[in-house]
Amino acid sequence: INRLIRCKIRRIGVFKVGRFFAEAESFENLGGWVVDQQSMNIMGSSYIMAHGLGSPVANAVTHIKLPESGKWYAYVRTRDWTAVWKRGTPAGTFKLMIDDVGFENTLGTNGEEWDWQYAGAMELEGGKTLRMSLRDLTGFNGRCDAVFLTTDKNDIPKNTEEFRREVSGVTAEEDETLYDMVVCGGGIAGTCMALAAVREGINVCLIQDRPVLGGCNSSEIK
């Protein structure tokens, strides 16, 4: 086995003039929001969820600096997780805020599939530290994957893997290391297999799509 792809990921920050991207799970303070990894293999990242059992949770907060002043258009990748039951009113809704001022549109109302929802537009000052936050409105599991800001009203984010890699700063490199064995999955079986092989002097690559090892016996399962 002599060819593997290694990814480098930048989670939050400006990557192009007139654009800004932030992963929700990389906010400095998640407040009452929690990180959920259940769709990581589909989405390419975790997302955060406002699990308040019907009571709005504390805001998730981070601080940003935009590259220029002007009118910024905001999009949030989210979904209405209750839309599949056609109940009429989305259960988990929230607002995107800058310095405690909310964009005009309520989020989490855009259908059952993950997609970019337009939050609204706002005049923002470049080069100044701004407080960006997610304000939960219901406490019923509103979901937020990422935030995208742009000064171009025609720069509408695409719900594609290619766009996601571009804005998240993901680059792929060939790993020139030669491996004797590749183990896919860091559950109990995969972790034990990889450790046993290493102890026998085998050069092993363990591939895992979770932040911790252990599978159903990991700290993710509570």
Protein language model annotation of sequence segments:
Residues 190:
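N-terminal Rossmann-fold NAD(P) dinucleotide-binding loop
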Residues 211-222:
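Conserved N-terminal glycine-rich FAD pyrophosphate-binding loop of Rossmann-like flavoproteins
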Residues 203-208:
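Short beta-strand "acidic-cap" motif of Rossmann-like dinucleotide-binding folds
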Residues 200:
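Conserved dinucleotide-binding and phosphotransfer motif residues
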Residues 1-173:
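Extracytoplasmic
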Residues 197:
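Aromatic pocket-lining residues of Rossmann-like dinucleotide-binding sites
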Residues 175-187:
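Beta1/beta-strand and adjacent pyrophosphate-binding region of the FAD-binding site
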